[in-house]
Swiss-Prot record:
EC numbers on record: 6.1.1.17
Alphabetized UniProt keyword annotations: Aminoacyl-tRNA synthetase, ATP-binding, Cytoplasm, Ligase, Nucleotide-binding, Protein biosynthesis
Swiss-Prot/TrEMBL catalytic activity: tRNA(Glu) + L-glutamate + ATP = L-glutamyl-tRNA(Glu) + AMP + diphosphate
Cystine bridges: none
Organism ancestry: Archaea, Methanobacteriati, Methanobacteriota, Stenosarchaea group, Methanomicrobia
Gene Ontology MF terms: ATP binding; glutamate-tRNA ligase activity
Entry's family note: Belongs to the class-I aminoacyl-tRNA synthetase family. Glutamate--tRNA ligase type 2 subfamily.
Native source species: Methanoregula boonei (strain DSM 21154 / JCM 14090 / 6A8)
Name of the protein in question: Glutamate--tRNA ligase
GO CC terms: cytosol; protein-containing complex
Gene3D superfamilies to which the protein is assigned, alphabetical: 2.40.240.100, HUPs, Ribosomal Protein L25, Chain P
Renumbered ranges of motif 'HIGH' region: 108-118
Amino acid sequence: MAGDEIKAALFLCALQNAVRHGGVPQAGAVIGMVMGAHPELRKQAKEVSAAAKDAIADVAALSPEERVTKLQSLSPEMFAALHEKHEKKKVLPDLEGAEHGVVMRFAPNPSGPLHIGHARAAALNDAYVKQYGGRYILRIEDTDPKRVDPEAYDMVKEDIAWMGLGITETVTQSERFPIYYDLCKQLIERGGAYVCTCENEHFKALKDAKKACPCRDQPVETALLLWEKMLNGGFKEGEASVRVKTDLLNPDPAMRDYPIFRILDAPLHPKIGDARVYPLMNFSVVADDHLLGVTHVIRGKDHIANTRRQRYIYDHFGWKVPVYRHYGRMGIEGVVLSTSQMHAGIDEGKYTGWDDIHLGTLRALARRGISPDAVKNAMIAIGIGDVDISFSWDNLYAENKKIVDPVANRYFFVPDPLEAKIAGASAHTAHAMLHPGHEEKGTRTLEFTGTVLIPRAEIFSVIVSSLNDISQGGDYESPQAKISSENVSPITSINEKKESVHSDNLPKLEGSLSSSLNDRKLVPRKYEPKREITMLRLKDLFNVNITWDGETPSFSYGGDSLADARAAKARIIQWLPAQSFVPCTLLTQDGEMKGACEPAVTTEVGKVVQFERIAFARIDAVTESGVRAYFTHT
């Protein structure tokens, strides 16, 4: 999108947001709406964010009456959408102590882009902040240099923008090391921590025996000197660490005097290359939750043990503990979620990038045409229960269908097409609706001049079904390269053309309809010559009779009457004029489907359309080979 188009889209979304909520539009919601409709703008996140501020300012300057009038005139569809009836959304359970507002946080590691697993915490926290009001903090937890990808900082923010989360502030932990160092000093002074110089194996043996190591009873002054020595480079990696004093009799060994600071010589942190003393997660999280005023923490129950560890630090400082809610584990199958596996796969060329549709990243979902609102709604529907579950892709697709079905334009896509001449048919013009629920969108025009492209599989299905009916249980025999005539021509190189092409340029190849069915035996040894087999309805055009003459199917005009087609229980199939189509490849997680689509599909790049009788698909690009589309769902 050009700059002016981005500004116009942002202004309309900001206008709709203001009219809907009766106030100043929220930047996160506006940006999320635009990026949800145009995921390709993720790469322009900074430009979009800057333009959003101007759009919001322009809308804020209008009176409520002016906003309504302007939205009605500029986008009647968006105004009408405000009054559409929606299903009642699932309500999340109340949070204890949230009556006066909340401060919540989403805290990912910058090891890669966000994936569907991150979306649960992100969406649940966002929903609660919107429900109760308050602040929503994005906290980049990058205190472990081994888990930092420099490119991930921007990717995480782009994914946050795509989701449309109402983030009010962003904090990066690597920028807060001086704060953590000062708090560690205070904790030592309070007698709540000490510097341990024991060898790891020796400390573990003592810990397992529920005994204190010699360092635990060191005077505060000694501990402070050792702490300064750590900061000044006086120890090598593994020679010293800071441990918090807990209960040595705790039945869980992992709770006994666990470390909160360690020394790492390598790798260097990309943002603070001179740092060698690193806070561990359980310390930096407590420090930030307290200093940032976090009131409620929603996270997975795999963090229950961390919650117990962190309470020791809260108690040492005398700080108020946030309200914790731990939800059950969510198993996700069918996609790759491991950042290390994704990294390796991209480096090896196994995946095309972070948005490869075999991955579980949010940007992969966006490329497939999944709406951010669908992701959020699916996660809110799952809720914060503590029972372990398996993530349902079908539920996500159902949520997405609610969003895309009312707006996606309809087109014909003919997979693995056959070119068929329709005997006895005069020229016809088909007028197919762009969307059955929006007459105002108008129609697509398809001109029939004698020859059409039809799906090969449909003809197989019809012929097999009909021959089964007339075979009387006889054996089947493959015609082996005999189903080829002036009426039926297999098209095997459809992707050689990138624009509308004519049938005169298509190869007339010898072949068999049965060849794509692994030599499936289609023709009965006993058949009735010139027997009418069945009727098909070419959608929005006319009826076609298929007859079987020996081993060759023939197609003839069967009239315009839709009533006749219904009476004959004719299958309604998609088609294309043989003289006007664009090659199209529909990519799925299992492979690809090559075929042809309407030329108008080339105007839908970046949008989700419905290929009638096939699936919803996001039009990704138009290349020299034709249209590239990604399967969304059925």
